[in-house]
Amino acid sequence: LERQKNQNWYEGWFNSSPWFTTLLSTIAGPLLLLLLLLILGPCIINRLVQFINNRVSAVKILVLRQKYQTLDNEDNL
């Protein structure tokens, strides 16, 4: 009886139903992963889109530079 008084509220649940720990650990992992994905997903996607846009703009600049020749300043004078 003294031991039960010293236990926390969650320890009583685990002692009364041992399957609860298994169920909780089985469900908690995927739920935490889903929560992290929902929180950090938009940030990761935003960084990825920004990186791809930077690379595409760099390729566009390279294509434009290849089409046109640069003029020397001495020839224009």
Curated annotation (Swiss-Prot):
Gene label: env
Positions of disulphide bridges: none
Keyword presence, NADP: no
GO cellular component, as recorded: host cell plasma membrane; membrane; viral envelope; virion membrane
GO BP terms in the entry: fusion of virus membrane with host plasma membrane; symbiont entry into host cell; virion attachment to host cell
Domains (record comment): The YXXL motif is involved in determining the exact site of viral release at the surface of infected mononuclear cells and promotes endocytosis.
Task performed by this protein: The surface protein (SU) attaches the virus to the host cell by binding to its receptor. This interaction triggers the refolding of the transmembrane protein (TM) and is thought to activate its fusogenic potential by unmasking its fusion peptide. Fusion occurs at the host cell plasma membrane. The transmembrane protein (TM) acts as a class I viral fusion protein. Under the current model, the protein has at least 3 conformational states: pre-fusion native state, pre-hairpin intermediate state, and post-fusion hairpin state. During viral and target cell membrane fusion, the coiled coil regions (heptad repeats) assume a trimer-of-hairpins structure, positioning the fusion peptide in close proximity to the C-terminal region of the ectodomain. The formation of this structure appears to drive apposition and subsequent fusion of viral and target cell membranes.
Positions of short motif YXXL motif: 68-71
Subunit and interaction comment: The mature envelope protein (Env) consists of a trimer of SU-TM heterodimers attached by noncovalent interactions or by a labile interchain disulfide bond.
Chain segments annotated as transmembrane: 25-45
Processing and modification events after translation: Specific enzymatic cleavages in vivo yield mature proteins. Envelope glycoproteins are synthesized as an inactive precursor that is N-glycosylated and processed likely by host cell furin or by a furin-like protease in the Golgi to yield the mature SU and TM proteins. The cleavage site between SU and TM requires the minimal sequence [KR]-X-[KR]-R. The R-peptide is released from the C-terminus of the cytoplasmic tail of the TM protein upon particle formation as a result of proteolytic cleavage by the viral protease. Cleavage of this peptide is required for TM to become fusogenic.
Site residues, Cleavage: 61-62
Keyword set, alphabetical order: Cleavage on pair of basic residues, Disulfide bond, Fusion of virus membrane with host cell membrane, Fusion of virus membrane with host membrane, Glycoprotein, Host cell membrane, Host membrane, Host-virus interaction, Lipoprotein, Membrane, Palmitate, Transmembrane, Transmembrane helix, Viral attachment to host cell, Viral envelope protein, Viral penetration into host cytoplasm, Virion, Virus entry into host cell
Lipidation (S-palmitoyl cysteine): 43
Cytoplasmic side: 46-77
Organism for this UniProt entry: Woolly monkey sarcoma virus (WMSV)
Ranges in the topological domain labelled Extracellular: 1-24
Protein name: Envelope glycoprotein
Domain of life: Viruses
